[in-house]
Design a protein with these regions (language model features):
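Acidic/histidine-enriched, beta-strand-rich ligand/metal-binding domains
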Residues: 1-68
């Protein structure tokens, strides 16, 4: 499942891999980072957050970058 952030300063999109419970977040500079232990509920909360930037900071702090 994928979500595009329209007109966001630094977030371009996020995608959730339900099989691996991983969220891939792509930035406007083209780089993609992956975060593990992210449920579908985490994905929904991120895409519907009032402030996607603040929510991203929470994901980054609590999940850590995923290393496949």
């Amino acid at each position: 499942m994928k979500h595009n952030f329209d007109n966001h300063t630094f977030l371009a999109s996020c995608e959730h891999d339900a099989d691996k419970n991983v969220m891939h977040i792509t930035f406007t500079n083209g780089k993609t980072y992956s975060y593990g232990d992210c449920s579908h509920d985490d994905f929904e909360a991120f895409k519907n957050a009032k402030s996607a930037g603040k929510h991203y900071a929470q994901i980054k702090a609590s999940k850590g970058q995923y290393q496949p």
